[in-house]
């Protein structure tokens, strides 16, 4: 058995589709432009963010400071896209957060939020996660403003199983969704979810794969904090 459908996976991997879903559910995102629209923008509208439509790991991402750099950034982003397409949008100045949810047996439960710092590795490297600290300093504001809308989005997509995470920007306490993963993250974040919120995402996915039931999902926030600090030894490690 598989915890997701190909339609769900494609909609969440495709940054354009994901942001359209967010907007339909009243969740803010960065303003997006077509290539033709971007060509007509005044320099005062810059910087822009240019990225592959369906890429990952910040590969092919560029912060474009002026109109003269747009074409090169688009070409680079397209080279990293499976679909050969790109996203052009406002560059958001703000801190990043990672928001976690867990789905099991049709129940979808908020499972934490962490403040995220990124660092560029080497001159030619892409920015990658350098530190996460949970809970986020603005956790309650997120819960008050967007938690219900995010859960409604997942339910409207028919999601019933699996780990979910969202990268969002926190701009002075206002959140803008950026992208989403319908899978485990690459930083063993299911440990964070288990230790800080009492939800075992790995056990829930094992149960789904074997036809079992991991029981009712109940978030039990713990006191204290949890940090993820990856040590990058060399490129690729």
Residue ranges of each PLM-predicted region?
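ATP-binding N-terminal substructure of ATP-dependent carboxylate-amine bond-forming enzymes
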Residues: 1-7, 24, 211-215, 233
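Basic phosphate/pyrophosphate-binding loop/patch that engages nucleotide-derived ligands
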Residues: 21-28, 69, 79-80
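Glycine-rich phosphate-binding loop of ATP-grasp-fold ATP-dependent ligases
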Residues: 31-32, 47-76, 86, 93-100, ...
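Structural element of the ATP-grasp superfamily
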Residues: 18-23, 88
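Short amphipathic alpha-helix with an adjacent loop that forms part of the alpha/beta core around
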Residues: 38-45
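ATP-dependent carboxylate/phosphate-activation module, predominantly the ATP-grasp catalytic core
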Residues: 90-97, 101-159, 163, 170, ...
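Glycine-rich active-site loop/lid that clamps phosphate-bearing ligands
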Residues: 231-237
């Amino acid at each position: 058995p598989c915890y997701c459908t190909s339609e769900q996976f494609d909609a969440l991997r495709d940054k354009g589709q994901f942001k359209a879903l967010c907007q339909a559910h009243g969740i803010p995102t960065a303003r997006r432009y077509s290539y033709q629209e971007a060509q007509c923008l005044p320099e005062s509208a810059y910087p822009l963010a240019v990225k592959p439509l369906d890429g990952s790991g910040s590969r092919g991402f560029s912060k474009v400071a002026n109109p003269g750099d747009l074409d090169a950034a688009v070409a680079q982003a397209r080279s990293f896209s499976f679909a050969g397409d790109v996203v052009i949008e406002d560059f958001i100045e703000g801190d990043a957060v990672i928001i976690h949810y867990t789905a099991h047996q049709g129940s979808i439960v908020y499972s934490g939020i962490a403040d995220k710092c990124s660092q560029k590795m080497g001159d030619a490297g892409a920015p990658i996660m350098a530190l996460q600290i949970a809970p986020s300093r603005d956790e309650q504001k997120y819960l008050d403003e967007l938690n219900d809308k995010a859960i409604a989005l997942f339910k409207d997509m028919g999601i019933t199983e699996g780990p979910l995470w969202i990268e969002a920007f926190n701009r002075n306490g206002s959140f803008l969704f950026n992208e989403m993963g319908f899978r485990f993250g690459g930083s063993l974040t299911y440990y964070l979810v288990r230790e800080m919120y009492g939800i075992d995402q790995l056990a829930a996915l094992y149960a789904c794969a074997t036809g079992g039931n991991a029981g009712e999902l109940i978030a039990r926030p713990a006191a204290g904090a949890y940090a993820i600090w990856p040590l990058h030894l060399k490129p690729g490690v």
